[in-house]
């Protein structure tokens, strides 16, 4: 991953041209990051992005163990379920494009967060009551699928709040996303007494904070 990141950096520096006119460019400085962090609207939406990402990583980090070791799925069936949820993210992205023609991003974001929170709560209830498969799989799908709408719209709204510092805003959001994802992944195995409950608790917790 470090090698890929280094290659991406080199391509960005030496291959991809800057498209913004020189007169509109903002010099890179730590002051730009400070200004971005001081903007409350940006911070609010950046936290939505971060905790939405954390919810997804709670699912990613635990799903293999929960479905194969606890629920007894074969590797092939687990791959099918995991792939279906990944397809759900693609469907959510396509749906978001259509919805933006009719509704404001903030309204779509609100509904997506509610769906994600309700579905994550059902995942937790299933984990606490013995993992009935069909409700669990359906709830998991609808806990993951809205993340495309959440991440896309929250990112757009966050950057819109600091248009002149869009690059710094993207950097701050990227840092926050992976910081929260890195923190939530070990928590899955530390709370609730089992990875299934831990996954549900972390998904619900992240979703609730994102809604707030």
Question: What residues fall within each predicted segment?
Answer:
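C-terminal membrane-cytosol helix-exit motif in multi-pass small-molecule transporters
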Residues: 2-22
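Helix-to-loop junctions at the C-terminal end of transmembrane segments
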Residues: 92-106
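Pair of pore-lining "gating" transmembrane helices in MFS-fold secondary transporters
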Residues: 38-58, 141, 145
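Short amphipathic helix-loop junctions that connect adjacent transmembrane helices
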Residues: 62-77
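Small-residue hotspots at the loop-to-helix junctions and early N-terminal turns
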Residues: 75-83, 170-171, 200
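A late C-terminal transmembrane helix in Major Facilitator Superfamily
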Residues: 157-197, 202-203
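Juxtamembrane intracellular "pre-TM" segments in multi-pass secondary transporters
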Residues: 17-48
């Amino acid at each position: 991953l470090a090698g890929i990141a280094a290659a991406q950096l080199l391509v960005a520096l030496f291959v991809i041209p800057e498209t913004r006119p020189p007169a509109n460019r903002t010099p890179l400085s730590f002051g730009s990051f400070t200004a971005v962090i001081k903007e409350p609207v940006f911070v609010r939406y950046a936290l939505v992005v971060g905790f939405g990402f954390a919810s997804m990583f709670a699912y990613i980090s635990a799903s293999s163990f929960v479905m194969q070791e606890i629920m007894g799925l074969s590797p092939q069936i687990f791959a099918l379920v995991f792939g279906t949820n990944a397809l759900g993210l693609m469907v959510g992205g396509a749906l978001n494009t259509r919805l933006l023609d009719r509704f404001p991003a903030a309204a779509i974001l609100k509904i997506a967060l509610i769906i994600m929170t309700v579905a994550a709560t059902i995942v937790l209830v299933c984990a606490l009551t013995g993992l009935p498969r069909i409700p669990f799989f359906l709830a998991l799908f609808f806990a993951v699928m809205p993340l495309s709408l959440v991440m896309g719209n929250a990112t757009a709204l966050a950057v819109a709040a600091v248009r002149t510092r869009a690059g710094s805003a993207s950097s701050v959001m990227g840092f926050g996303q992976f910081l929260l994802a890195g923190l939530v992944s070990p928590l899955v195995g530390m709370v609730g007494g089992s990875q299934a409950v831990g996954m549900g608790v972390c998904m619900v917790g992240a979703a609730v904070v994102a809604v707030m």
